[in-house]
Amino acid sequence: MAQWTLLIVFFCVATAAAGLSFHDSNPIRMVSDMEEQLLQVIGESRHAVSFARFANRYGKRYDTVDEMKRRFKIFSENLQLIKSTNKKRLGYTLGVNHFADWTWEEFRSHRLGAAQNCSATLKGNHRITDVVLPAEKDWRKEGIVSEVKDQGHCGSCWTFSTTGALESAYAQAFGKNISLSEQQLVDCAGAYNNFGCNGGLPSQAFEYIKYNGGLETEEAYPYTGQNGLCKFTSENVAVQVLGSVNITLGAEDELKHAVAFARPVSVAFQVVDDFRLYKKGVYTSTTCGSTPMDVNHAVLAVGYGIEDGVPYWLIKNSWGGEWGDHGYFKMEMGKNMCGVATCSSYPVVA
C-alpha cells in the first residue's frame, strides 16, 4: 500500500512541477511521462488524461488507490452529467470545476446550509418609487463590490452573503473598500438563530451585528472555516449596522428596484445537483423549489440584465473565483427561479 500511496503523491507533485493546467492545449504530451503509472492505478479510460489535468489544476490529493479510483469514477459520472446537460443547448452550460470529483451528497453536506424559514421577508419594508428602472445594472462597475471569497468546507454561505452586502454598503457610504469577518458571524451569531457552518440567514446576521455593536475586519478576526468560540473584540469593530431592509417574499419587482437604486442585496435560493458545475449562461431549473423552506444557499445579487432575450440576475457566489463565471452566475429573472426572491435583504450601515 505504501508503494501505491507514493505513486499517487508523485503523480500530483509531478504534474504541478510541469506547470500543467486544465486548459493546456496539448496535455497528452505533457503528461506522457507519467501516463503509464496513472493507468496502472485507474486503468485505461478515455477520461484518464482529463482526470490528470483536473487533479493537477485543483491540487487534488488522494491518499490511497481506492480513494483515487473512487474519485475517478465520480469524476467520470460528473463528466457525463456535463456532457448530457450541454447537449440540450439550454441557456447555460456546465463545466469541470473543483467539485467535479465530489458526489452531490458530499457537496450538499460541505457547501450548503440547512433550510430555514425566512420570516423576516413575509412582509417587506423596501419602498418602490415611481421611476423608470435602468435596463441593466452591475454594481461592480461602480467599484463597490468586493472580491469573490471561498467559504471552503463549511456551510457558512450566509456569512459571506452578509459580509458581501456590508462591504458594498460600506464602500458606497464611505468611498473605500473593506474586508469584513465571516468568522465572527460563524462563531458569535448563534443567539440570532444562526448555526455557524450548518447555516444561517443574512437578515438574522444583520440583526446580530446591529445589537452586538458591530463587525470586525477580516484581518482582525480571520476566517478558519470551522465552528469556534466567539472571540469578538469591540475595539476592532469596523462597521456597524443601523438596520436592514427586507424584500417582500417572492417580490422580484421590489428586489429589482432595490438592486437598481439601493445597493447589492443578500438573496438566497435552492441549489440543486447540476448547479455546482455551472460554468456560464443564464441558469434555470425545473427541479428546484421556491418556498422559504427550499432555499439552502445565500449569495449576493449585484446586478441584472438581459442575455439572448432572457432577463437575469447577476449574482456573486462564495465558492472561489475559479467557480462559474469568475465566481459569479446569472439566474433567470421573472419566475422567482429557485426562490431567488424568497429571502432577500440589505443592510443600512453606520
Curated annotation (Swiss-Prot):
<keyword id="KW-0788">Thiol protease</keyword>
<feature type="active site">
    <location>
        <position position="157"/>
    </location>
</feature>
<feature type="glycosylation site" description="N-linked (GlcNAc...) asparagine">
    <location>
        <position position="177"/>
    </location>
</feature>
<dbReference type="InterPro" id="IPR039417">
    <property type="entry name" value="Peptidase_C1A_papain-like"/>
</dbReference>
<feature type="glycosylation site" description="N-linked (GlcNAc...) asparagine">
    <location>
        <position position="246"/>
    </location>
</feature>
<keyword id="KW-0645">Protease</keyword>
<dbReference type="InterPro" id="IPR025660">
    <property type="entry name" value="Pept_his_AS"/>
</dbReference>
<keyword id="KW-0458">Lysosome</keyword>
<dbReference type="Pfam" id="PF08246">
    <property type="entry name" value="Inhibitor_I29"/>
</dbReference>
<comment type="subunit">
    <text>Interacts with KPI104 and KPI106. Composed of a mini chain and a large chain. The large chain may be split into heavy and light chain. All chains are held together by disulfide bonds.</text>
</comment>
<feature type="active site">
    <location>
        <position position="297"/>
    </location>
</feature>
<feature type="disulfide bond">
    <location>
        <begin position="154"/>
        <end position="197"/>
    </location>
</feature>
<feature type="active site">
    <location>
        <position position="317"/>
    </location>
</feature>
<feature type="signal peptide">
    <location>
        <begin position="1"/>
        <end position="19"/>
    </location>
</feature>
<dbReference type="GO" id="GO:0006955">
    <property type="term" value="P:immune response"/>
</dbReference>
<feature type="propeptide" description="Activation peptide">
    <location>
        <begin position="20"/>
        <end position="113"/>
    </location>
</feature>
<keyword id="KW-1015">Disulfide bond</keyword>
<dbReference type="GO" id="GO:0051603">
    <property type="term" value="P:proteolysis involved in protein catabolic process"/>
</dbReference>
<keyword id="KW-0865">Zymogen</keyword>
<feature type="propeptide" description="Removed in mature form">
    <location>
        <begin position="122"/>
        <end position="132"/>
    </location>
</feature>
<feature type="disulfide bond" description="Interchain (between heavy and light chains)">
    <location>
        <begin position="288"/>
        <end position="338"/>
    </location>
</feature>
<feature type="glycosylation site" description="N-linked (GlcNAc...) asparagine">
    <location>
        <position position="117"/>
    </location>
</feature>
<dbReference type="InterPro" id="IPR038765">
    <property type="entry name" value="Papain-like_cys_pep_sf"/>
</dbReference>
<dbReference type="GO" id="GO:2001235">
    <property type="term" value="P:positive regulation of apoptotic signaling pathway"/>
</dbReference>
<dbReference type="GO" id="GO:0005615">
    <property type="term" value="C:extracellular space"/>
</dbReference>
<dbReference type="InterPro" id="IPR013201">
    <property type="entry name" value="Prot_inhib_I29"/>
</dbReference>
<dbReference type="Pfam" id="PF00112">
    <property type="entry name" value="Peptidase_C1"/>
</dbReference>
<dbReference type="InterPro" id="IPR013128">
    <property type="entry name" value="Peptidase_C1A"/>
</dbReference>
<dbReference type="InterPro" id="IPR000668">
    <property type="entry name" value="Peptidase_C1A_C"/>
</dbReference>
<feature type="disulfide bond">
    <location>
        <begin position="188"/>
        <end position="230"/>
    </location>
</feature>
<dbReference type="InterPro" id="IPR000169">
    <property type="entry name" value="Pept_cys_AS"/>
</dbReference>
<protein>
    <recommendedName>
        <fullName>Pro-cathepsin H</fullName>
        <ecNumber>3.4.22.16</ecNumber>
    </recommendedName>
</protein>
<keyword id="KW-0732">Signal</keyword>
<dbReference type="GO" id="GO:0005764">
    <property type="term" value="C:lysosome"/>
</dbReference>
<comment type="similarity">
    <text>Belongs to the peptidase C1 family.</text>
</comment>
<keyword id="KW-0325">Glycoprotein</keyword>
<comment type="function">
    <text>May play a role in proteolysis leading to mobilization of nitrogen during senescence and starvation.</text>
</comment>
<keyword id="KW-0378">Hydrolase</keyword>
<keyword id="KW-0926">Vacuole</keyword>
<dbReference type="GO" id="GO:0004197">
    <property type="term" value="F:cysteine-type endopeptidase activity"/>
</dbReference>
<dbReference type="InterPro" id="IPR025661">
    <property type="entry name" value="Pept_asp_AS"/>
</dbReference>
